[in-house]
Amino acid sequence: GYSYIILFDDYNKIDLTLLPLEELGNYLNDDKLIKIILDKDGRIQQAVVPTDMDYHIRKPSAREYDDCCNEFWNTTTYVVKGLCRKEILFAIDHFNQIVRHELLRMISWKVGIETGFKLSVGKNYKFIERYISEDLWEKLLSTYRMDSYENIWEALFLCHQLFRAVSGEVAERLHYAYPE
């Protein structure tokens, strides 16, 4: 199929997807957030009700939890290496692409535990603020200052504190071993 993003003069936007009829069934099963605007030939037999169920936070297995911890802690060494070698873009890239991702994933599991794994925090965690304390949110935002080596060091140490606290809580609540 082909997808087009259409932006109208009034700033409304539509993601339009055109596809061969033989792909219709798979398309309807693959993405539960679609909304059918027009089915002029009546080819869709059942009502399509958009739901974000497929995007709800999922309870991690013990292995997924452990992998998240390992990825976080092991990748912080690359951030440190970049900072020590004065390779700021290398450090920022590892920080933002991996370390921050694992921190946000761990925080989302905390949210999942607190909400029964019945919601989504949105693409790129855009709704996570709604479900965490103001203190955690403010600290998380403080890790985004990346305009100097000093600020990156401070952000990294704060990420360490946040990850240790949140991952310890997640381990305790899910009865998983925290990797020391």
Which residue ranges define each predicted feature?
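Conserved nucleotidyltransferase catalytic core and NTase-mimicking acidic/glycine-rich helix/loop elements
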Residues: 56-180
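Conserved NTP/Mg2+-binding pocket subregion across the NTase superfamily
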Residues: 1-90, 94-96
